[in-house]
UniProtKB/Swiss-Prot annotation:
The keyword Cell membrane does not apply. The modification Arginine amide is found at R65. Residues 22-33, 69-74 form a propeptide. GO terms for biological process: defense response to bacterium; defense response to fungus; killing of cells of another organism. Keywords: Amidation, Antibiotic, Antimicrobial, Cleavage on pair of basic residues, Cytolysis, Fungicide, Membrane, Secreted, Signal, Target cell membrane, Target membrane. This is Antimicrobial peptide HsAp4. Transmembrane segments: none annotated. Belongs to the non-disulfide-bridged peptide (NDBP) superfamily. Medium-length antimicrobial peptide (group 3) family. The keyword Membrane applies. It is found in: Secreted; Target cell membrane. Its main location: secreted. Residues 1-21 form the signal peptide. Expressed by the venom gland.
Length: 74
């Protein structure tokens, strides 16, 4: 892999971890508290990471809200 690809991969990984950390500090609703009572910390962390990755994918697929992605217009 080229240095550029490695750098991009590292930066995206750091962004995902940072966003997951920010998400974990948000106020939890009663539903989330009930849901978390039966799950381990590792499961919660992986769930947060998956949620962040899904949001990033949605953001890359349609970068401008209210407009469809270019691939969907054709």
């Amino acid at each position: 892999m080229s240095r550029r690809r490695i750098l991009i991969l590292v930066l995206v990984t750091m962004l995902v971890k940072t966003m997951a950390g920010m998400e974990s500090k948000w106020v939890e609703t009663t539903y989330e508290i009930k849901k978390r009572s039966g799950t381990s910390e590792k499961e919660r962390e992986s769930g947060r990471l998956l949620g962040v990755v899904k949001r990033l994918i949605v953001g890359f697929r349609s970068p401008f809200r209210g407009r469809r992605a270019i691939s969907e217009q054709t």
